[in-house]
Amino acid sequence: MLQIGEFSRLSRISVRMLRHYDQVGLLKPAEQDAQTGYRRYAASQLAEANRITVLRDLGFPIREIGRLAHADDGELARALDDRARELEEGIGREQRRLADLRRFRQEVE
């Protein structure tokens, strides 16, 4: 078992975020000492922590990560495809804004 600090170092998730993930039920420690409250994680939970980190980095909200953390590959693939479409739409909007900005800038001269 890994204490929270060691798990934090290995997973690259801050202790504060691990506590938050525990509170919201996203990543529960394998065990927690009833007297001290110390959290201990199993090494096998590092894969789950990695999936959570990747999904966070891709912009998924915590609520959806909770659903996807244990999803099968098909459900995860659909969610990733949906997120890719959202990002592409956002990029398109930003490109249009940039074009508008450049046109406006030329008018200022």
Predicted segments, located by residue:
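Short, charged amphipathic alpha-helical surface segments
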Residues: 53, 69-109
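Phosphopantetheinylated carrier protein domains
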Residues: 65-67
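Basic helix-turn-helix/winged-helix DNA-binding cores
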Residues: 1-63
